[in-house]
């Protein structure tokens, strides 16, 4: 339960496209993620997605931004904890053909039955049915629009 007595919403699992946009300085995406955090929306960032995003731009700024995301109140980092999780991740890679960072996103979303938050839903469509539970994908359709704002909505169906 959340502090206001309502049910805590299912976490969003952030994919590499969202993290990369943030590290590249996309203010709209960063503001969107900060808005989710301010509203108490839980967010999960798989550790290997952080690795994938940090490969895009190798810099101290990128590292600082990724460390900053970890400090947000509603963000939790999903580590690759042990051999069992590593073997499960390998199975996801084998079943989907995804690279390790996207496969970690898929594995976390699959295990927790949480939606993947992405900038590229098309990238995920072919993998929606590859896992034990169908992946649910939410595409950020208009990153400059505040969550719950007017118009078509900041989140679009994946």
Region roles according to the model:
Residues 72-95:
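Acidic catalytic patch
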Residues 19-28, 47-68, 90, 94-96:
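A short secondary-structure junction motif
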Residues 45, 80, 100, 118-119:
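Short beta-strand scaffold positions
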Residues 18-19, 49, 104-105, 122-124:
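Alpha-helix capping/helix-boundary segments
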Residues 1-27, 45, 50-51, 158:
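Metal-dependent nucleic-acid phosphoesterase active-site entry motif
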Residues 13-14, 30-59, 73, 77-81:
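PIN/NYN-family metal-dependent endoribonuclease catalytic core
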Residues 99-115:
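Acidic, metal-associated active-site segment
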Residues 1-7, 110-158:
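Acidic, PIN/NYN-like endoribonuclease modules and their adjacent C-terminal/linker elements
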């Amino acid at each position: 339960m959340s502090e206001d007595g309502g049910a805590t919403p299912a976490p969003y699992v952030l994919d590499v496209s969202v993290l990369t946009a943030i590290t590249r300085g996309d203010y709209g995406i960063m503001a969107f993620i900060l808005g989710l955090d301010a509203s108490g929306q839980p967010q999960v960032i798989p550790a290997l997605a952080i690795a994938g995003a940090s490969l895009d731009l190798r810099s101290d700024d990128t590292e600082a931004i990724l460390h900053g995301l970890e400090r947000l109140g509603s963000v939790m980092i999903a580590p690759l904890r042990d051999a069992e999780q590593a073997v499960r991740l390998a199975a996801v890679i084998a079943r989907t053909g995804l690279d390790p960072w996207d496969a970690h996103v898929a594995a976390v979303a699959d295990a927790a039955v949480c939606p993947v938050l992405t900038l590229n839903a098309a990238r995920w469509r072919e993998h929606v049915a590859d896992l034990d539970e169908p992946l649910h994908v939410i595409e950020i359709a208009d990153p400059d629009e505040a969550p719950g704002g007017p118009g078509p909505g900041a989140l679009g169906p994946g």
